[in-house]
């Protein structure tokens, strides 16, 4: 009679623990915290999907007990044991450990630097490569990943084609004062991209409806909770599209992202103590006001902004507090917008542009509008903005050969995620933030 081989213990993630109640499993992770109570140890492990409490008894499992006793924080460990329901434990389950393998023990003489206590922000940013291991930071990064996934899924579902824009560019897109200049090959000058927009205008003429998603760089000397020098943007562009088309696309995109995060990352939002009821109401249509009316709102609030001024953080916050959804501000003065923005035929002093301002004071998350399609007008605008025509000959070709009305926008990922998470500062929502005085680690 042959003996049946015993099935190996399933290797699971902490996130899956509830599916394996009363079963013996193996989990691979790191020691997050440890509590001792006489002859019992209560280690808490993390594995990137969550944290779980374990229990091991000196009497029942002496080898496992000795392996864990005195183990240092963030030591890497593989544990095997039985999952039991425990309402008092994080996540509602705990593991009764039967075997332990210590993969790497953190030295006691050089302990893990981020202890379970308060640390200063500069210290945490210096240790950002370790700070992201904490449950709060990991939750934010999972929300960011969900926002990226849902945004791309939404654009794909509408028939937009993902195209890639270059990082090195020959000229400015948003203005010369915020360019990062780099030395290119054979004494050529190049710049880090400020936006992929000009390039998606080209691919939109090839593919109809497109978007790009990637990093952008702005050498803005702004030290605020809303600014990074490197951030990610999703930028759609569509041929035969107008301002209203992009406003509606922006409403649908932001709503889809927020609802997807609220549904699929509820646990992470709860960890951040985010008021999900504020997110659940983010559905189209969003409130809209003209730039003219926005000035009136600011005047009523006692803000000194006058017609023709651009809006900064203070102005955006005042306007956003009038609404519980993102607000669309449309038709800004043409003089404050980029050279490629089309003007309103009924009021040429206005641009066919819009910004979407997030509620709760998180500022602009979308900026876009309708582009110029006239070759002659675009040449004139380049000259008015003192931009080198030779660097934009390829862009002018788009107006020479089959120009059509087209429109698009850019959505700033980090500001959007910061708003969804309710974080105080944008530096928490990107794995390795690049700011005015920080490029390390």
Feature annotation, model-predicted:
Residues 273-278, 397:
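Short linear capping/connector segments at secondary-structure termini
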Residues 178-256, 263, 281-441:
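A translation/RNA-centric and nucleic-acid-associated enzymatic feature enriched
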Residues 164-171, 262-275:
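Short, glycine/acidic-rich hinge or "gate" loops at secondary-structure transitions
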Residues 91, 117, 172, 253, ...:
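Flexible domain-boundary/linker segments
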Residues 139-143, 277-283:
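Extended, non-catalytic structural segments that build the interaction scaffolds
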Residues 2-239, 418:
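Class II aminoacyl-tRNA synthetase-like tRNA-binding/catalytic domains
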Residues 145, 149, 166, 273, ...:
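An alpha-helix initiation/capping motif
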Residues 153-161, 256-265:
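Secondary-structure boundary elements
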């Amino acid at each position: 009679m042959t003996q049946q081989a015993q099935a190996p213990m399933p290797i699971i993630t902490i996130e899956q623990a509830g599916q394996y109640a009363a079963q013996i499993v193996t989990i691979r992770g790191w020691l997050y915290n440890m509590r001792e109570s006489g002859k019992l140890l209560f280690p808490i492990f993390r594995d990137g999907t969550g944290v779980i409490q374990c229990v091991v008894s000196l009497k029942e499992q002496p080898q496992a007990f000795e392996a864990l006793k005195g183990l240092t924080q963030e030591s890497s460990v593989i544990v095997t044991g039985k999952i039991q329901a425990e309402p008092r434990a994080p996540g509602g389950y705990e593991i009764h450990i039967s075997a332990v393998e210590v993969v790497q023990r953190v030295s006691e003489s050089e302990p893990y630097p981020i202890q379970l206590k308060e640390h200063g922000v500069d210290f945490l940013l210096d240790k950002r490569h370790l700070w992201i291991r904490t449950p709060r930071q990991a939750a934010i990064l999972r929300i960011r990943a969900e926002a990226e996934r849902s945004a791309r899924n939404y654009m794909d579902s509408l028939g937009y084609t993902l195209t890639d824009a270059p990082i090195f560019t020959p000229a400015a897109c948003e203005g010369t004062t915020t360019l990062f200049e780099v030395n290119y090959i054979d004494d050529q000058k190049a710049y880090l991209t400020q936006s992929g927009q000009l390039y998606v205008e080209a691919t939109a003429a090839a593919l109809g409806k497109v978007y790009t998603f990637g990093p952008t760089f702005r050498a803005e000397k702004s030290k605020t909770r809303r600014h990074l020098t490197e951030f990610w943007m999703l930028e759609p562009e569509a041929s035969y599209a107008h301002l209203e088309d992009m406003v509606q696309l922006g409403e649908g995109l932001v709503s889809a992202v927020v609802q997807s995060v609220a549904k699929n990352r509820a646990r992470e939002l709860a960890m951040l103590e985010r008021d999900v009821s504020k997110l659940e109401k983010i559905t189209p249509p969003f409130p809209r006001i003209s730039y003219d009316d926005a000035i009136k709102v600011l005047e009523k609030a006692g803000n000194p902004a006058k017609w023709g001024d651009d809006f900064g953080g203070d102005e955006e916050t005042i306007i956003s507090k009038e609404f519980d959804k993102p607000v669309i501000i449309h038709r800004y003065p043409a003089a404050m917008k980029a050279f490629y923005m089309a003007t309103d035929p009924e009021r040429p002093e206005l641009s066919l542009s819009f910004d979407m301002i997030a509620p709760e004071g998180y500022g602009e998350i979308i900026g876009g509008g309708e582009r110029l399609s006239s070759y002659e007008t675009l040449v004139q605008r380049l000259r008015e903005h003192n931009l080198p025509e030779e660097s934009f000959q390829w862009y002018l070709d788009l107006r020479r050969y089959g120009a059509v009305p087209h429109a698009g926008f850019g959505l700033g990922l980090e500001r959007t995620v910061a708003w969804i998470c309710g974080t105080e500062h944008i530096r928490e929502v990107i794995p390795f933030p690049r700011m005015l005085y920080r490029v390390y680690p």
